[in-house]
């Protein structure tokens, strides 16, 4: 019997988290436990170590609103060297089909603009503080058919009550990620093998692309991308509440209740006019998958910490 070698992810005290569910702007700190302390707290789940992620909390002070925006683009710094049309014809490598095609360049999405927008709200007094953030991101990959869109929102609220005897922390977060995964490295491999005099487009074709069918080992890599759909959607909805009671003599009792709903959906479709459909006499092919996971956790602990002679600290935790 083997335990997982992957580290246990603990987000704001809730074990079993997923780093993909957190926006980078919301992370305050990341700590790694890899010694006996990991096993002492989390047991056999921590056999591969523990990654502790703490999200940002509000700071005391006036309510502040901030905005961060990013714009970016990508370029290929160095491309593979292949024969262009003139060299291909001059050396008599193959049949001259009349076109002049940069197959590698046809698959690139150079110059496309990616953007990211984040709005933060933070502030409050000693008794009640709030931190909230909203993020939207549209990332254009350098390859056609390799794009991603992300949306997320988070609210962290903290309360100190009864002269700091009682501390309450509330967290809720929603994140959604859409991924276009039509691209593949195999298409770039094919682009390096293609005849540079072959046509990319065909005005007589219903698709508009020169779809190469038959027994040839070569195919139009751009048509391969454009005549199919490969969408993946991830959704996370999380909420947790922590109640901490500060007791005399260095003792404290804490309980954390967490809830997480994760949904994952795949939608893949290949057109009836795609090369693989025509070669296989298919009228198109589709695939849809959906999964949903709900996790509920409860973590009660009792803590002890005392400082002796200003230099010596003794701490213990049980839970």
Regions found by a protein language model. Give the residues of each.
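Short, small/polar-rich motifs associated with maturation and membrane association
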Residues: 1-155, 160-161, 166-169, 175, ...
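Surface-exposed loop/interface segments of Gram-negative outer-membrane beta-barrel transport/assembly proteins
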Residues: 59-100, 142-146, 152-238, 256, ...
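Intrinsically disordered, low-complexity regions
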Residues: 104-105, 189, 249
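Long hydrophobic segments that form regular secondary structure
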Residues: 120-123, 244-249
């Amino acid at each position: 019997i083997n335990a997982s070698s992957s580290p246990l992810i603990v987000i704001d005290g809730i074990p079993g988290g997923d780093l993909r569910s957190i926006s980078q702007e919301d992370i305050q700190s990341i700590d790694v436990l890899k010694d006996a302390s990991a096993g002492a707290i989390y047991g056999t789940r921590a056999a591969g170590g523990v990654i502790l992620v703490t999200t940002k909390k509000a700071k005391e002070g006036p309510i502040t609103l901030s905005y961060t925006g990013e714009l970016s683009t990508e370029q290929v710094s160095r491309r593979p060297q292949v024969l262009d049309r003139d060299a291909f014809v001059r050396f008599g490598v193959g049949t001259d089909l009349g076109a002049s095609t940069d197959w590698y360049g046809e698959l690139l999405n150079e110059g496309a603009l990616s953007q990211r927008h984040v709005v933060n709200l933070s502030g409050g007094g000693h008794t009640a503080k709030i931190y909230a953030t909203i993020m939207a991101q549209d990332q254009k990959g350098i390859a056609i058919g390799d794009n991603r869109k992300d949306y997320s929102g988070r609210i962290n609220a903290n309360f100190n009550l009864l002269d700091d005897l009682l501390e309450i922390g509330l967290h809720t977060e929603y994140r959604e990620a859409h991924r276009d995964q039509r691209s593949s490295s195999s298409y770039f491999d094919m682009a390096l093998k293609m005849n540079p005099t072959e046509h990319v487009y065909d005005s007589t074709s219903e698709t508009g692309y020169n779809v190469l069918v038959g027994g040839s080992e070569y195919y139009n890599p751009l048509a391969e991308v454009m005549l199919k759909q490969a969408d993946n959607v991830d959704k996370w909805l999380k909420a947790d509440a922590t109640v901490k009671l500060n007791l005399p003599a260095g003792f404290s009792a804490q309980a954390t209740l967490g809830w997480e709903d994760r949904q994952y959906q795949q939608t893949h479709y290949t057109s009836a006019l795609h090369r693989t459909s025509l070669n296989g006499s298919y009228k198109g092919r589709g695939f849809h998958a959906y999964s949903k996971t709900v996790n509920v956790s409860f973590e009660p602990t009792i803590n002890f910490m005392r400082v002796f002679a200003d230099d010596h600290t003794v701490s213990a935790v049980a839970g």
